[in-house]
Amino acid sequence: MVLSVDEFLQLRDQNPLVDVRSEGEFREGHIRDAENIPILNNDERIAVGTEYKQKGQKDAIKTGFKLVGPRLNDIIAETERVARGKELLVHCWRGGMRSSNFCQFVGMAGIKTHQLKGGYKAYRQRATEAFQKPFQFLVIGGCTGSGKSEVLRTLADKGEQVIDLEGLAHHKGSAFGALLQPPQPTTEQFQNELFEEILKLDLTKRIWVEDESIT
């Protein structure tokens, strides 16, 4: 079944999500909670792209099948591990051949799938649209180390809507930086994480954020 972005995300709590793009594309940015099972890895994707430019689509498709063939058992085994007997949510970049072929391959192994219409590109477009909506932001200001993050957590505990920008960025501002933090996400991934937080909010109500100034 082909699903819109909203339909796709609504099923995410019950169904595992698989991103079949290359590992390089996945590292640059991905949908929250997605597992990466590349149908073409970085080098293979380049090879298929080169074949497409030099010889056309038909030869590129043949090259793709030739590259995927020896790894098909491994792809299906990894997919079974991720699926755990559940139906899978699957996407590639544009909802094209990579996700379609992946769904066909694992379908022959008895794994049911749902494909994201428009792929990751549609998800990114949906995020951009969300960022254009009006927000009622209230900003907590103060010097670095003055306890802004603690105030934010207290507000969240009291039921206020909060976006923890430092938490999403894995960063504590200019003075403390990434000290004791996980690696910082790419700009694209930060945008994705911010979009995921916005999806949880009631945009008719106020939203508290923290000012990142050090003065």
Residue ranges and their predicted role:
Residues 157-215:
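Conserved nucleotide-sensing/catalytic segment adjacent to the nucleotide-binding pocket
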Residues 89, 111-124, 164-169:
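A short glycine-rich beta-strand->turn/loop micro-motif centered on a GG-aromatic cluster
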Residues 62-116:
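Catalytic cysteine-centered active loop of the rhodanese-like fold, especially the PTP/DSP P-loop
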Residues 97-98, 136-157:
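Glycine-rich phosphate-binding P-loop
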Residues 17-21, 34-37, 163, 208:
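Short hydrophobic beta-strand that contains or immediately precedes a catalytic carboxylate
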Residues 23, 27-77, 83:
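Glycine/alanine-rich phosphate-binding loops at beta-alpha junctions
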Residues 103-108, 149-162:
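A conserved segment at the C-terminal end of the G1
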